């Protein structure tokens, strides 16, 4: 048996504003040390998985898994190496990184 609760007034809190949702998604991506470190490494330019793994002291497959999450979030994308198309390099999507930064700053101000 379900009892309805009386309505006392308008709720003070509603659904989060879109900028809060965006900031939450960005914060979720950066909440992991490895993902945050990958984004910091990629600030210097395109880098392959093996170079990131060596710099971070992580295994290649772990870095690849984190890159997949960052790619799904739109923060990074893969590019083929000019001299050897077998090699994938990752780079930041600077527009997406700037949008994530702006979303976080809007919420934190």
Language model segments and positions:
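Short, Lys/Arg-enriched N-terminal segment that forms or immediately precedes the first helix
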Residues: 7-27
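Residues within the DNA-recognition helix of helix-turn-helix
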Residues: 66
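Long, compositionally biased intrinsically disordered regions
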Residues: 1-5
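Juxtamembrane/membrane-water interface recognition
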Residues: 35, 72, 106-108
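Conserved segment of winged-helix/HTH DNA-binding domains
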Residues: 88-109
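Beta-hairpin "wing" of winged helix-turn-helix
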Residues: 51, 72-83
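N-terminal helix-turn-helix DNA-binding core of bacterial DNA-binding proteins
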Residues: 21-62, 83-95
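Alpha-helical DNA-recognition elements
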Residues: 69
